[in-house]
């Protein structure tokens, strides 16, 4: 069940369906980013909306998944195109990075979504677009 819920959550991410993501979150859902920062609802809902504005073609690709009990580990890649304040997608702002996600589920919903990834590719693009 945990891997089914985790894959549904990934589908909602790839669809940029924040409402669908929220429907799959527990009331006390926590998102943990690659720096270890923890975010909870409703801040995480605003955060996803802002992220999809910043990377309008953000995607997650799962290559392998492992599940034990209520924990799923998803291995794959994430990527997209960073869009600066001007809202223009430029090929040079495209990025992709390996990533691992850990989904902890409870009662058919995602209680914690944690990502381990190297975000330096997108940070470098952001720094370049500011200068």
PLM features: what roles do these ranges have?
Residues 67-71, 103-110:
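Short, solvent-exposed coil/turn segments at beta-strand boundaries
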Residues 25, 78-80, 117:
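Short beta-strand segments enriched in hydrophobic/aromatic residues
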Residues 111-131:
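Low-complexity, intrinsically disordered terminal/linker segments enriched in charged
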Residues 18-22, 26-70:
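A solvent-exposed, acidic/Ser-Thr-rich amphipathic alpha-helical stretch
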Residues 77-107:
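Exposed beta-sheet edge and beta->alpha loop/turn motif
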Residues 4, 57-59, 94-97:
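Short solvent-exposed loop/turn micro-motifs enriched in small/polar/acidic residues
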Residues 1-27, 129-131:
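Short, low-complexity N-terminal intrinsically disordered segments enriched in polar/charged residues
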């Amino acid at each position: 069940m945990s891997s089914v819920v985790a894959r549904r959550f990934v589908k909602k991410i790839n669809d940029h369906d924040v409402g669908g993501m929220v429907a799959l979150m527990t009331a006390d859902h926590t998102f943990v980013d690659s720096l270890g920062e923890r975010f909870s609802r409703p801040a995480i809902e605003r955060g996803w909306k802002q992220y999809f504005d910043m990377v309008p073609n953000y995607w997650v690709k799962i290559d392998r998944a492992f599940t034990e009990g209520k924990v799923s580990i998803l291995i794959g890649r994430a990527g997209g195109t960073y869009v600066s304040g001007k809202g223009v997608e430029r090929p040079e702002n495209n990025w992709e990075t390996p990533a691992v996600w850990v989904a902890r589920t409870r009662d058919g919903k995602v209680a914690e979504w944690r990502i381990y990834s190297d975000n330096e590719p997108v940070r470098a693009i952001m720094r370049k677009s500011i200068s």
